[in-house]
A protein has these predicted regions:
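N-terminal structured subdomain of primase-like DNA metabolism proteins
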Residues: 1-104, 160-163, 168
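TOPRIM fold recognition
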Residues: 1-10, 54-59, 256-259, 267-409
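Residue-level preference for well-ordered alpha-helical positions
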Residues: 16, 69, 84, 142-143, ...
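Short, well-structured beta-strand/strand-turn elements
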Residues: 24-25, 144-158, 276-287, 373
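Terminal peptide-recognition signature
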Residues: 35, 55, 68, 141, ...
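Conserved active-site segments centered on acidic
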Residues: 78-136, 140
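Tandem CBS (Cystathionine beta-synthase) repeat/Bateman regulatory domains
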Residues: 131-176
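Phosphate-handling DNA/RNA-contact segment within nucleic-acid enzymes
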Residues: 164-302, 318-320
Length: 409
């Protein structure tokens, strides 16, 4: 009678010990170890809760017995007996030869030159007319604070789940150019298609330039992964595809004397709707490659002052309170709250402040005034921990209580 993985008297962490795998990164759920199959450092993800492993480079995967058995080329029964023997002696298993598994080299991808903004706008605008917004996504946008009219005006649409080729064919027949438009690519048979994945389902957020052209698309994922909620519609890894270019989103009047700078187009759209103010939105606080050109355009159109309104993590209290993320479970300081500084919080605050400093530096070089904008402060002038984004603060000013389901904003 064979035991199931759950009934075995050892865990996958014991196998990691026996094989003497070097752990490069760990948290309460999983470890990233050196792969014994291809030798790549830190690519073998070992899930402690599920008792499984997978190499993100060579693709080797399986359960805890399979990990040991595959390394020593044994059947599962023999592997199980050896595992129990070595664990009983509290000793590691014999040395083994790391098999340098060859990874099939991919063909070099040839990208198309990114199309001009006007072409992007025409193609994306036509694409949006062919798509719909699901009731689920509409409800989420309403819960965030948008009105139905604003949702319609901004052009949010749900990602399609099939018919990518036919959508592309319809666009081409409508006179649209797809070559050089991020998201579109050419398949091996020469047919053009659209790069949507089921694992990246969500709703599309049009990203607009100062001139009002749709120059990119972000996707708000239904199921975020690796702490990622937003991704670009891109085909940079596909034949004749194109990268997003990470453009800066603008909403409002570029001739306003005051413009607010924040992170994320959806946050900017909502903040503009709630306040009536103009917002420029970088894709991420440290994604500033396109920022100088945007600020220069704003300066030429009459902008006198830019307010930095990045998230209030920039004033995050870094004292350890065992409340930050799953890493707190394994932190040695968790039982001594308030006595130590949280390294994770320090890293997060440093990341946000780095983006702030870069914005200040660009504005200084271009001779545009820039000031920090803050809210939700405690008595010590640090973030009180309630209203993280400028959209949260503006929503709160409206006298509404955000729905619990809106914690993912």
């Amino acid at each position: 009678m064979y035991l199931t993985d759950e009934e075995l008297p050892f865990g996958i962490d014991d196998i990691v010990f026996l094989l003497n795998l070097e752990i490069r990164h760990k948290n309460a759920v999983s470890w990233d170890c050196d792969c014994p199959f291809c030798g790549k450092k830190g690519k073998l993800n070992v899930n402690l809760q599920k008792g499984v492993y997978r190499c993100n480079r060579c693709g080797e995967a399986g359960g805890k017995i399979g990990l040991y058995a595959s390394v020593y080329h044994l059947d599962n029964g023999t592997a199980c007996e050896q595992i129990k023997e070595y664990l009983g002696k509290n000793s590691q298993a014999p040395a083994y030869q790391v098999y340098k598994k060859e990874i099939e080299s991919k063909k070099e991808v040839v990208n198309a030159r990114r199309a001009p903004d006007l072409v992007l706008h025409q193609t994306y605008s036509e694409l949006l007319t062919m798509l719909t917004l699901s009731e689920t996504h509409k409800k989420k946008l309403l819960e965030r604070g948008f009105s139905e009219e604003e949702i319609r005006k901004n052009g949010y649409k749900s990602t399609p789940v099939f018919g990518f080729r036919s959508l592309t064919e319809r666009l081409i027949k409508a006179g649209c150019t797809v070559e050089g438009v991020p998201g579109f690519y050419q398949e091996e048979d020469g047919t053009w298609s659209l790069r949507f994945k089921r694992s990246c389902a969500g709703f599309l957020i049009p990203v607009r330039s100062i001139e009002g052209f749709i120059v990119g698309m972000q996707i708000r994922l239904d199921r975020p992964f690796d702490h990622t909620k937003y991704i670009w519609l891109s085909s940079v890894n596909d034949n004749m595809g194109a990268g997003s270019g990470s453009p800066v989103h603008f909403v409002g009047n570029p001739e306003d004397e005051i413009v607010f700078m924040t992170e994320g187009p959806l946050k900017g759209d909502l903040s503009h709707f709630l306040s009536g103010r103009s917002f420029a939105c970088v894709p991420g606080v440290n994604q500033y490659a396109n920022l100088p050109d945007v600020i220069l355009k704003l300066k030429r159109s009459g902008v006198k002052l830019i307010y930095e309104t990045y998230d209030m993590d920039k004033l995050l209290n870094t004292a350890c309170q065992a409340d930050y993320d799953e890493a707190c479970v394994s932190c040695e300081f968790r039982k001594e709250k308030g006595k130590h500084q949280c390294l994770k919080k320090i890293e997060k605050r440093k990341h946000i402040q780095g983006g702030c400093k870069k914005l200040y530096g660009i504005c200084r070089e271009l001779l545009v005034a820039c000031k920090q904008f803050v809210w939700d402060l405690d008595a010590e002038g640090m973030w009180a921990g309630n209203l993280k984004g400028v959209d949260d603060w503006l929503y709160d000013l409206k006298g509404k209580t955000p729905d619990q389901a809106d914690e993912d904003r």
